[in-house]
Amino acid sequence: MSASADHTFDIKSARLNLFSIRLRSTRLADITRDLDNRFSADSPFSRTPAMLDVSQVNPVELDYRGLVARFAQYGIHLVGVRPTPAGLEGALDDAGLLPLGGDEALDESRLEDEPQPQTLVIDKPVRAGQQVYARGGNLVVLATVSAGAEVIADGDIHIYGSLRGRALAGARGQRDARIFVRSMQAELLSIAGIWRTLEQDLPAALASRPLQVLLESDKIVMRALPD
């Protein structure tokens, strides 16, 4: 028997898709109030991992343990902080958070060598509990995405059936990514880590119409597609 056969586990590299929670306030009470207002009913999240983006606030003023507890109440499990705040390693350890480094720029020379994005086509329904990820390209779903299902793409997402679950476009930060949907009944929409839940019925001008979802000024907006 070889030495490797005696090992009880292997270590391999992996890429994980995480929501990014970009804080705009350091006041735990205000953040808690916003969570309550946005998710006063059932949260669309269930044990969903996310990272905390503290680039827009003073990280010294944050109650990290409190943030972990508050977001966990709504199914969002914070696993790390980015960019890593200097001198706060002890506070992160105490809250069970990992330092995830900074926002390093992409190496353009490497991008030139990367293959052109591919399109993943799914011709069957995506059912509750299933996740489909189009890594490095666009995703086309020719059927329905059920409630409790999740579709993710580094590029655009096109859904020719009903979207009743979650759709996350621009998963690697592509802010010009879009989501195109024939029938919008989504639990959650996300582009480049910025997300929005649909807690109310769509306006009459958008209901029962094919829609596109895009990012404008750090906000998710929906527009009807031309007839």
Curated annotation (Swiss-Prot):
<comment type="subunit">
    <text>Interacts with MinD and FtsZ.</text>
</comment>
<keyword id="KW-0131">Cell cycle</keyword>
<dbReference type="Pfam" id="PF03775">
    <property type="entry name" value="MinC_C"/>
</dbReference>
<dbReference type="GO" id="GO:0000902">
    <property type="term" value="P:cell morphogenesis"/>
</dbReference>
<dbReference type="InterPro" id="IPR013033">
    <property type="entry name" value="MinC"/>
</dbReference>
<keyword id="KW-0132">Cell division</keyword>
<protein>
    <recommendedName>
        <fullName>Probable septum site-determining protein MinC</fullName>
    </recommendedName>
</protein>
<dbReference type="InterPro" id="IPR036145">
    <property type="entry name" value="MinC_C_sf"/>
</dbReference>
<dbReference type="InterPro" id="IPR007874">
    <property type="entry name" value="MinC_N"/>
</dbReference>
<dbReference type="InterPro" id="IPR005526">
    <property type="entry name" value="Septum_form_inhib_MinC_C"/>
</dbReference>
<dbReference type="GO" id="GO:1901891">
    <property type="term" value="P:regulation of cell septum assembly"/>
</dbReference>
<keyword id="KW-0717">Septation</keyword>
<dbReference type="GO" id="GO:0051302">
    <property type="term" value="P:regulation of cell division"/>
</dbReference>
<comment type="function">
    <text>Cell division inhibitor that blocks the formation of polar Z ring septums. Rapidly oscillates between the poles of the cell to destabilize FtsZ filaments that have formed before they mature into polar Z rings. Prevents FtsZ polymerization.</text>
</comment>
<dbReference type="GO" id="GO:0000917">
    <property type="term" value="P:division septum assembly"/>
</dbReference>
<dbReference type="Pfam" id="PF05209">
    <property type="entry name" value="MinC_N"/>
</dbReference>
<comment type="similarity">
    <text>Belongs to the MinC family.</text>
</comment>
<dbReference type="InterPro" id="IPR016098">
    <property type="entry name" value="CAP/MinC_C"/>
</dbReference>
